[in-house]
């Protein structure tokens, strides 16, 4: 691509994805692996992980609604943050005052362990060199040490904002243009925990969530989302994974989830967020697993499985 703005460049991109869902009556498990090079994907390991989770979900029990301490695995955290980010860290949403950031930029609203960026240049993700308007990509700090720092912009939203505002290279694919600029490369800094087991020990008494689905935005200005857990939800007792749980309905304010974070894993995972329903645009969230002091369960669903 060559633009009148002086940018000239080219990009060749690939992505490889292995998704595994192991399910039978009353049991299910899920795992995935995403990379830009097929050599970095191990379908056999993905399948084994899904099967192991499924084996542990049989005979799932119910859980009373309430506020629980929780560990969210990277698949769960990736999906939760991607939904939150599209409304929160969009420059257009900020201009239209429908973003959680509205009136809060520069304030510490999250735990100081939480730092989030939009970074399409990170080779651990699915790198992109420029956006759909031909603007070069860049790393955009969104949250630093719990402080809300900024949003992403495309050419129209930056022009509307005026002043010295410039596009950050976040124009989305044509099918998504109505939403304005979007952060397609969410990256959360890892923490100090060496394993998920260490996070489970920190939580001590709560729940573990592998994956989410059917997410919906309830109140974007407050960052409230609702959805269901699936394919591997467990009770945490005495710092260990205990009995499996049925699928749970949750309604959370994401800022509450991120406000008190006992820990995050050092290792991050590329959680696949590619759309397979219309125009496909491969992207993902580079995230650790996280321990949170608040995850609000508001109801129960059916058991795992088919």
Show where each model-derived region lies.
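N-terminal small-residue-enriched
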Residues: 1-306
